[in-house]
């Protein structure tokens, strides 16, 4: 039996204290065994930590194997923080619309008539040029990158071109000889 103050030679009126002999690690684990650390991770209890099967069970729970951790693991797998976009699963590119919704493209003879139109004789509609050019957001690559608050780079699919790299461009300017000149102009 151990007294509370073994070096004291005076008789004590305090009762003797019996302390169980435990390793320091298990004493700390016992004190925090019922407190969850977050996201389904729990420290092993003293009775569980003695056997190897209990240790493997605790590791599987900590990794999200069963119970409360399963929901966390599922959520973690659905949205991984590897820097990939949730649009990365698309196998094929979406079709690129060349006209506005619910309209049909202008035929070449209509464009020729508009070009030959004389504004003195008739009311002429302006010629509208449509072409496909590189996306300005992703520079034709289909992916863009941005940085989060803490400086971590995130790469995802370009939204304006839907990951294709090219977009429909339209203008009513008449001083254009080559449509690609517009792509090379500084903005």
UniProtKB/Swiss-Prot annotation:
The regions listed as transmembrane in this protein's record are none
GO terms classed as biological process: chloroplast organization
- Segments annotated as CXXCXGXG motif repeats: 135-142, 158-165
Q: Name one GO cellular component term.
A: chloroplast
Coarsely, its chief localization is plastid
Q: Provide the cofactor list for this protein.
A: Zn(2+)
What topology does the record note for this protein and the membrane?
Peripheral membrane protein
Subunit annotation: Homomer. Interacts with LHCB1 proteins, but is not part of the signal recognition particle protein targeting pathway.
Q: Any idea what job this protein has?
A: Protein disulfide-isomerase involved in chloroplast development in cotyledons. Involved in the process of vesicle-derived thylakoid formation, probably at the level of the integration and folding of LHCB proteins at the initial location of integration. Acts only in germinating seeds after dormancy, during the transition from heterotrophic to autotrophic growth.
UniProt name for this protein: Protein disulfide-isomerase SCO2
Q: Which organism is it from?
A: Arabidopsis thaliana (Mouse-ear cress)
Gene designation per UniProt: SCO2
């Amino acid at each position: 039996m151990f007294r509370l103050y073994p070096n004291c030679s005076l008789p004590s009126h305090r009762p003797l204290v019996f302390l169980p002999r435990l390793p320091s690690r298990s004493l700390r684990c016992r004190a925090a065994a019922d407190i969850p650390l977050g996201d389904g991770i729990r420290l092993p209890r003293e009775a569980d930590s003695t056997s190897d099967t209990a240790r493997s069970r605790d590791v599987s729970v900590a990794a999200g194997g069963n119970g409360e951790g399963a929901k966390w693991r599922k959520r973690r797998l659905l949205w991984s923080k590897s820097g990939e976009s949730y649009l990365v699963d698309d196998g094929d590119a979406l079709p690129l619309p060349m006209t506005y919704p619910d309209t049909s493209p202008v035929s070449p003879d209509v464009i020729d008539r508009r070009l030959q139109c004389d504004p003195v004789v008739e009311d002429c509609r302006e010629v509208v040029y449509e072409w496909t050019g590189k996306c300005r957001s992703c520079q034709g690559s289909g992916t863009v990158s941005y940085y989060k608050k803490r400086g971590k780079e995130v790469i995802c699919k370009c939204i304006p071109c839907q990951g294709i790299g090219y977009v429909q461009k339209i203008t009513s300017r008449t001083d254009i000889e080559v449509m690609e000149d517009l792509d090379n102009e500084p903005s």
